[in-house]
Swiss-Prot record:
Inhibited by PMSF. Not inhibited by benzamidine, aprotinin, SBTI, EDTA, EGTA, 2-mercaptoethanol, iodoacetic acid or pepstatin A. On the 2D-gel the determined pI of this protein is: 4.55, its MW is: 31 kDa. Serine protease. Has fibrinolytic and fibrinogenolytic but no plasminogenolytic activity. Cleaves after Arg and Lys residues. Cleaves fibrinogen alpha chain, beta chain and gamma chain in that order. Belongs to the peptidase S8 family. This is Fibrinolytic enzyme 2. Optimum pH is 10. Active from pH 7 to 11. The active site is at S5. Residues 1-32 form the Peptidase S8 domain. The lineage of its organism: Eukaryota, Metazoa, Spiralia, Lophotrochozoa, Annelida. GO terms for biological process: proteolysis.
Length: 32
């Protein structure tokens, strides 16, 4: 996984942002 992150940092960053956004969305909908 670390090798893929080094070779494609933009892909890893995008996946991280999407994962974080999904977690926040689920938490937000869960609180509501």
């Amino acid at each position: 996984i670390s090798g893929t992150s080094m070779s494609c940092p933009h892909v890893a960053g995008r996946a991280y942002v999407l994962d974080t956004s999904l977690r926040v969305y689920l938490l937000d909908t869960g609180l509501r």
